């Protein structure tokens, strides 16, 4: 093979790589356009309520739905942060194509205030089109170290809060014979892990409630969807110079098994369009764990017990 043949091969490979890169860029651009159009057609002019809109997932949902022209009801426990979020949304959007969001202070740890919140929202909006239940309180600790007061608090935030809210809005949804209820839930609603007793219990409870609700309201034209995700990837609170192999094991926000808040928000939008009933956002390891739990329960129990033993062995004495 002569020098000219080698140069010709190099040029051919360069053109092949360039074509592949341009094709990938074109596909990504087309995907972005389709997603943008989907947002506009799916939530345009619809009244959308988002609980815990101050969380990472809630924030991404607010951005995506606001850009799509939804009439947002943003709920959160901190009024100042809600105002800051609303200011951010309105300053970054075209006022002729979007609506200023309605802000509602909502804290599921104060269950006595929830009926007032329901009345306030129904007075402002006679009906709701989409309800996104995104509130969640996380806790990881040995069961013997948790007080009953903490157990009740987790159940209020993760279970009693969402079901109280959905019961308050359900009569108006049934009377209109339309609506879409979305539960953003953890994979712990399907798979219980050690050191997350009350958290997993609350997620199992709310998962079961919404699955029963789905069957009961289908005849009224109401769709109920559940999205079970693995760990949400966010910026770690551990300083870079203090990150160790052990902290990487326990700080799940750094693990490659997690999903990004933006991915969850995008999946919510797709679900609104497709009306899919159940979505599992997980990599192959969590999915495999679900199958092992169903098909080989004794093996799963042994693995979980071994994980507990390893955790105890790695814990240094105080």
Curated annotation (Swiss-Prot):
It is an enzyme of class 1 (oxidoreductase). Its main location: secreted. It comes from the Eukaryota. Keywords: NAD, NADP, Oxidoreductase, Secreted, Signal. InterPro entries: NAD(P)-bd_dom_sf, Sc_DH/Rdtase_CS, SDR_fam, SDR_family_member_7C. The active site is at residue 199. Transmembrane segments: none annotated. CDD domains: 11beta-HSD1_like_SDR_c. The keyword Nucleotidyltransferase does not apply. It is found in: Secreted. Substrate binds at residue 186. Its EC number is 1.1.-.-. GO terms for cellular component: extracellular region. NAD(+) binds at residues 49-73. Pfam families: adh_short. One of its GO terms (molecular function) is oxidoreductase activity, acting on the CH-OH group of donors, NAD or NADP as acceptor. GO terms for biological process: intracellular calcium ion homeostasis. PANTHER family: DEHYDROGENASE_REDUCTASE SDR FAMILY MEMBER 7C-B (PTHR44668:SF3), PTHR44668. Putative oxidoreductase. Belongs to the short-chain dehydrogenases/reductases (SDR) family. This is Dehydrogenase/reductase SDR family member 7C-B.
